[in-house]
Every structure is written in C-alpha cells, then in structure tokens.
A protein has these predicted regions:
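Phosphate-binding glycine-rich loop
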Residues: 28-75, 89-93, 99-101, 168
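PLP-dependent aminotransferase class I/II
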Residues: 35-40, 48-51, 112, 126-130, ...
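Short beta-strand->loop structural element characteristic of the AMP-binding/adenylate-forming
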Residues: 96-106, 325
C-alpha cells in the first residue's frame, strides 16, 4: 500500500487555537502582551537573561550582527553548509562573509576547523556558529578561543531548540543566539524568530532596531503609568517585530516543546536502529546524548557505495509518496557567492562530500511507527 508522508508536518494539537482566539478577542493583534510573555517564557527556558521576539530567524541574525557593530569592511566567518540567510545578513550590513568547511560526520564547525580558519583569515570580526540539524557545536572550546582573539560569536540556532551542550541550553552561551520559528521548525509561530542574550546593551539595541529604531514600542507606551503617544527615533531601524497572533501560537508550542522533542528523538532512534547496517548510507553522528539533540533534521548521506545517485533517490522516494529534502546546497555553489568571492568546490572538501549525497528524511512528532517502517522499507528497496 502506498502511503503519503510529507517531509514536514506541524503539530497544533495544543492550546494554539485558544491563545490565538484570546488575541483576536482582545482587539490588539500586533506586538503586545502575548509577545512579551513569549519572550519571558523562552528566556527562562534556555537560561538567557533577555529575549527579543522578531518576525523571522533571518531578522534575528540581521539584528544580532547590527547590534555588535558589523558594517562595511568587516569580515564574518560563515560555514558554506548552511541556509543562505546566515550569509546574506552579513551582506545586508555591507560586510563580507568568509566561508569555511564543516565536519563531515556532524556538519558542524569544529574547534579545529575554526582555529584553522581564524589563523589563516585576518581581521575576522565575528563567527556565525550554526548548530546544524539540532546538535550543538562545541561551545565550551569555541567560546574561549574566539574571546582570546577578540572575535564575537553569533549563534545560528535555527535548528537548535531545544538543544544542550554539556548540560547548558543553546541560548546561554555566546554573545547573541538566534532562533527560528519558521513553519517547519521544532516549534513554530508560522513565521518568527527570537534573539537571546545576557548582554543588556545588545538586547536594548535589538529591541529598538526591530521596530524602526523607535525608543519605545506602542505596547510600552500604552502600558506606561502616563500613557503617551510620544516617542523618539534614535537610529534607522527595521520592521522586524513579532505580532501577538504569532506569539500566541509560540506560547502554545513552547508549552509542549519537551514532548515534541522527545517524539522527534523517537523517530531518530527508529532510523538509527533500522538503517545502521546499510553500508551505502552514512548516518548523522551524535557527539553528546540523543536527549541533548533537538532533532530538527535527520540528514543522511548516500556515500560512494550507493548505486543510486542522490537526485534519483529523491525521485524514487517521491514515487513511493515520501517527502524528502536537501540540507543544503552549499553556499559556495550558489551563483552570487561563487562569483562575488571566487569560491571553489575544492576548498570545501567535507561540504562537497556531504552535498553530493545528502538527503533529509521526514522527522516530526506525529510520524507514526507504521510510517517509519514504510520509510525504512522504501529506502532498502531503492538502495538494495
């Protein structure tokens, strides 16, 4: 029997409808009480002092780089194996991304890769550390090394909620951590994101810049003891604020974040148990506990022993009704970055090896055991 299994599926089985209805009934749909509540609850969850909700993970990355003073002439280290947003926000500010390779087994920038890149690339202002797939990078080593060189760290945690490293949540490590709440992420607001930092000055800058550079947002003005229309513009900011309708969904998602993560881990364990004996597949390597991984992605690599090319594999999976994806076509292969910076595939050997065979399998909380059996059976039939 042919099943129809999408690559991603949102779980809105909690209080999403109730909280959205509360917002609609309130008559206040833009940034207000629900957004502030989500910021408070999210910062408490990850152990950061301050949180600033925005309308996308890309906006979070942009604000983070702006807050640390990134501008024309600056250089920011970015892995080639990431989504374009990680690099494009560098260009928004007139700075230049400098691209590096990643570890083959984890897709992470390791301390060794980072040290080599920073020692051979002069005047790097900041590093974008991507916690790929839901697994945290080795922040306990990366942080002190970067700080010893005066290099700032922005964590791209679009995949990494909730993730831990050595007992600490992602969101409690570096200068600023940026999360995404896009529709296919581990928790969602449809579109949305969050910055978390322990630095009050950075937080205040992000909060001002997310709404046109205005020193007081409308909810602050409305809720103040002496309600006032008056405000000041202290910088040319952006329109990045999160509306309360989105925040309402986020609050409901956050309530069940632990359960959602556990269910994704269940799927990951099923894949490991049922695909580990296939020598034509390289499974993702988990460096810490399975329970510390957010499991946003389960990305396999069809290695040199696979008789079926990656693109044909995706086509055959689709014929069986199974959605898959690719994470990612590397940035050094994208026309803009390749041509502007003269990037060559041979300078990114691990990324190239990953890219040629990587396929992301469905992994979401409502994926049933029957569907997981069907996916694994289909993979075996295709690869032989």
């Amino acid at each position: 029997m042919l099943l129809k299994i999408p690559f991603a599926k949102v779980d809105c089985s909690g209080n999403e409808w109730i909280y959205v209805q509360e917002v609609l009934n309130s008559g206040w749909l833009t940034t207000a009480g629900k957004t502030h509540l989500l910021e408070k609850q999210f910062s408490e969850y990850v152990g950061g002092k301050f949180a600033c909700a925005v309308n996308s993970g890309t906006a979070a990355l942009h604000l983070a780089l702006e807050a640390i003073g990134t501008g024309p002439g600056d250089r920011v280290l970015v892995p080639s194996m990431t989504f374009t947003a990680t690099a494009e926000v560098v260009r928004y500010l007139g700075a230049d991304p400098v691209f590096c390779d990643v570890d083959y087994a984890t897709r992470l920038v390791t301390p060794a890769i980072l040290k080599d890149a920073l020692l051979h690339q002069p005047e790097i202002k900041a590093v974008m550390i991507v916690h790929f797939g839901g697994q945290a990078a080795e922040m306990e080593t990366i942080l002190p090394f970067c700080r010893s060189l005066g290099v700032r760290i922005i964590e791209d945690a679009a995949h990494a909620f909730p993730s831990r490293r050595r007992g600490k949540w992602v969101g409690s490590f570096g200068d600023i951590t940026c999360f995404s709440f896009y529709a296919n992420k581990t928790i969602t607001t449809g579109e949305g994101g969050m910055l978390v930092t322990d630095n009050e000055a950075l937080f205040k800058r992000c909060k001002v810049m997310r709404l046109h550079g205005i020193d007081r947002d409308i909810w602050d003005r409305y809720m103040s003891a002496a309600s006032s229309w008056e405000y000041d513009v202290i910088a040319p900011g952006y329109k990045y604020n999160m509306p309360d309708v989105a925040a309402a969904i986020g609050i409901a998602q956050l309530e069940k974040a632990d359960l959602l993560r556990q269910e994704r881990e269940r799927c990951a364990k099923f894949y490991f148990n049922n695909l580990a004996d296939m020598d034509s597949i390289d499974l993702p390597e988990v460096r810490e506990s399975m329970a510390d991984h957010a499991w946003h992605l389960f990305s396999i690599v069809l290695n040199e022993r696979s008789r079926v090319p990656r693109n044909r594999f995706i086509e055959l999976m689709a014929e069986k009704g199974i959605g898959t994806s690719v994470h990612y076509k590397p940035l050094h292969r994208m026309t803009y970055y390749r041509e502007r910076y003269g990037l060559r595939p041979e300078d990114f050997p691990n990324t190239e090896r990953i890219w040629k065979g990587c396929v992301s399998l469905p992994i979401y909380p409502t994926l049933s055991d029957e569907e997981l059996v069907y996916i694994c059976k289909s993979i075996r039939e295709i690869l032989g």
